[in-house]
Amino acid sequence: MVITHHGGQCFKVTFGDLTLVFDPIAKNSTLPPVRFGADIALVSRDHPDMNGVEEVTYGDKVPFVIAGPGEYERQGVVVQGFLSKSVYGLDKGQTEAVNTIYSVELEDMTLVHLGALADTELSKEARENIDDIDVLFVPIGGLSAQASDGVLSPADAHKLAVSLEPKIIVPMHWSLLAQTGGIGKSKALETYLKEAGNSSEKVEKLTLKKKDLIGHDGSILVLTP
């Protein structure tokens, strides 16, 4: 399995001839859109920063789209989606939006992508069904209740990530802030790593097999877009 970061909350996961993408970036996003073919596309939040299904419909690949809670299976990949809340990128008059947390099982590993999560606790259903996480993608954009980007603050992100006991933690959403600007917001990654207090490693891509997870216990890996 090879995991690469394409900005914001977008991660491409390839294994064999199959490509899965979390939160592909659309053309009308403030972020650079993605452009590659995917077999499976998971959309956590209906927003241009995360719903670019057309951009991953490319060549001979037309993705099977998952855009909400439920149980799914496609080409040997098992996906569970759990309802949660986001306050990211709300339209005028909105107070909250639907966010979907995804648990994906493939190659004997479990990947969990929290999406644009604002809830500091997972639902009972998610807690009961998500277990033994190998790779956790956690949003770290909001800096505080007063200067929130609509997702978890670095402190809340760290607390939730630790409670889920993943083998590897991959922070996300920080590059979205760095690219779109905002006072202090581009420092979200620095703030998160300071909050976490343990060492981290920056990599351009994550090549992973089940055996590689031995010895990992909450290791933080920063995938650079």
Q: Which residues fall in each region the model found?
A:
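Binuclear metal-ion centers of metallo-dependent hydrolases, dominated by the metallo-beta-lactamase
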Residues: 4, 8, 96, 158, ...
